């Protein structure tokens, strides 16, 4: 877990959208799967920014804080990675954001696919401890917005190519720099300066594309 300065209610149609997209990771070989019935130790210990609640991994960074947590179960080569993410309390729909971490090497070197409660998404690279924009913030077609919204996020990596999806609709593709010796994957969240945002994650799944 890393922190850096910087009621779970959902409408029925949000739930339906998430359920219909539940099989997004289409690889035949499941490499890792977590429905968060229990907090697996490969997520680390619960703390003030991350806990298990009602079968969800709940992440709540303090105001103006970044949080990311890789899962240490495996090192992967190519992956098809997906998760259901709920915006519980966004506080600021432009400045709050959450998503998936991939091509993770260490605290200073990884990529993040992020979605904000306003329906915009972006991709960032953290290299040598600095944030580098890979895909600038822009509208993500098919994204559900606001508090209570559930969105299925998906990342596929094949070699140096990565593709990003929101609720089954492709957002962008890019050519990046994957680690030479395998990647970890995980989750990511940011709270705005106005206050602590809360996001929850469920149905985290990694398959072989």
Spans of features found by a protein language model:
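Extracellular beta-strand elements of beta-rich domains used
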Residues: 36, 202-206
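Extracellular carbohydrate-recognition regions
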Residues: 23-45
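Short, aromatic/His-centered strand-loop micro-motif at the edge of beta-sheets
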Residues: 129-152
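Flexible glycan-contacting loops in extracellular carbohydrate-active proteins
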Residues: 174-202
């Amino acid at each position: 877990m890393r922190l850096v300065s910087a009621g779970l209610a959902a409408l029925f149609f949000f739930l339906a959208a998430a359920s219909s997209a539940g099989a997004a990771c289409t690889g035949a070989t499941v490499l890792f799967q977590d429905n968060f019935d229990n907090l697996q130790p490969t997520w680390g210990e619960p703390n003030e920014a991350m806990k298990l609640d009602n079968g969800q991994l709940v992440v709540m960074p303090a105001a103006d804080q970044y949080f990311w947590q890789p899962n240490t179960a495996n090192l992967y080569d190519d992956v098809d990675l997906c998760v259901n993410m709920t915006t519980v309390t966004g506080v600021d729909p432009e400045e709050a954001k959450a998503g998936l971490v991939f091509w993770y090497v260490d605290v200073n070197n990884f990529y993040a696919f992020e979605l904000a409660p306003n329906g915009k998404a972006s991709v960032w690279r953290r290299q040598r401890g600095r944030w580098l924009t890979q895909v600038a913030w822009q509208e993500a077609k098919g994204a559900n917005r606001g508090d209570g919204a559930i969105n299925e996020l998906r990342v596929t990596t094949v070699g140096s190519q990565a593709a990003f999806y929101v609720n089954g609709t492709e957002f962008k593709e890019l050519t990046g720099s994957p680690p030479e010796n395998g990647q970890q994957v995980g989750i990511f969240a940011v709270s705005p300066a106005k206050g602590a945002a809360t996001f929850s994650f469920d149905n985290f799944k990694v398959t072989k594309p």
